[in-house]
Regions:
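Conserved catalytic/switch belt of AAA+ P-loop NTPases
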Residues: 97, 150-163
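Structural recognition of the conserved hydrophobic beta-strand(s) that form the central parallel beta-sheet
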Residues: 139, 161-167
């Protein structure tokens, strides 16, 4: 089923472009949606909005590619990861959710009983778990290697909805050829439970759009 009829998607539904509508409908129609999206296209915000409507616990995961490994930075796991989840925080504000109460926290475990529905972890700490009855958002997927994506995706049960978000023109890995994003797009493209979509309209403005068009 696509986006439920008469659901305004936190006010986004009337303003969705054709590309965004296909993206949103795919999340409700398929177990796996892979989106190759430019900057400023609303990819993470729409994914989080859909996850809220789907109603399953959300696991939001990412690659701390700037550090290479979170283990070498000071602080708790939660403190190390906090600077990487800004797209999630922005998305929650857009759907009028308070991140302090939506995201599970080691510092405040009681909020789980108060409606916290999101676990935010780097792929390093997620990949050893079984991912059941959840929505899994893999953000910045272009910065995960084939091996890292494989370790994540092989943990997913059939009861989980997966949204794999990336931009194949913004790979931050030292060796871009190691990115698993494009190979996994082609690997899953023809599977009946998967849909691959693109988002190309940058809503931040002409400057951001033009900057994103530079290739090397």
């Amino acid at each position: 089923m696509p986006l439920p009829e008469h659901n305004l998607l936190f006010g986004f539904e009337p303003k969705l472009t054709d590309e965004q509508r296909k993206y949103v409908d795919s999340i409700f129609d398929n177990q796996l949606t892979i989106v190759n999206a430019k900057s400023g296209t609303g990819k993470t915000t729409l994914a989080v909005a859909c996850a809220k409507i789907v109603g399953k616990p959300l696991i939001y995961t990412f690659s701390p590619v700037e550090e290479g490994s979170l283990g070498f930075t000071p602080g708790t796991v939660e403190e190390k990861e906090s600077k990487y989840i800004q797209p999630l925080l922005d998305a929650l504000v857009e759907i009028r959710e308070d991140p302090r109460f939506a995201i599970k926290s080691e510092k405040n475990p009681d909020i789980i009983n108060e409606g916290a529905w999101i676990t935010a972890k780097s792929h390093t700490f997620v990949r050893g778990t079984n991912i059941k009855n959840s929505t899994l958002i893999i953000d910045e997927s272009q910065n995960l290697t084939r091996g890292e994506l494989k370790k994540l995706l092989t943990r997913v049960h059939s009861s989980t909805t997966v949204i794999m978000i990336g931009h194949d023109k913004q790979i931050d890995l030292k060796d871009p050829k190691k990115s698993g994003f494009r190979p996994y797009i082609e690997h899953f493209r023809d599977e009946p439970y998967c849909n691959v979509v693109e988002l190309n309209i940058n809503f931040r403005g002409k400057l951001a759009q033009h900057a994103d068009n530079l290739e090397w």
